Amino acid sequence: MGMRMMFTVFLLVVLATTVVSIPSDRASDGRNAEVNERAPWLVPSTITTCCGYDPGSMCPPCMCNNTCKPKPKKSGRRNH
């Protein structure tokens, strides 16, 4: 197969993919069906932290009252 023929086949594949994807996007109204059908109890409504109501997490106590010391920066190009 020559280069011209391969390019023509490539264009046909791109065109066919575009034509197939346009109607499916209209049918879904531009939204992701998976997100719309997600069970509400699986979506977290509050942010849980290690100092909140999750006692099983491994969290240092200094994170609860913001007294943790910052880690020293490593030497390197990005830290100038």
Swiss-Prot record:
Compartment annotation: Secreted
TM ranges: none
Cellular component aspect of the GO annotation: extracellular region
Post-translational modification: Contains 3 disulfide bonds.
One GO MF term: acetylcholine receptor inhibitor activity
The keyword Ribonucleoprotein is assigned to this record: no
Propeptide: 22-38, 76-80
UniProt keyword DNA-binding present: no
Main localization category: secreted
Glycosylation site list: S45
Protein keywords: Amidation, Disulfide bond, Glycoprotein, Hydroxylation, Ion channel impairing toxin, Neurotoxin, Pyrrolidone carboxylic acid, Secreted, Signal, Toxin, Voltage-gated sodium channel impairing toxin
Signal peptide: 1-21
InterPro entries in the record: Conotoxin_a-typ (IPR009958)
Protein name: Conotoxin SmIVB
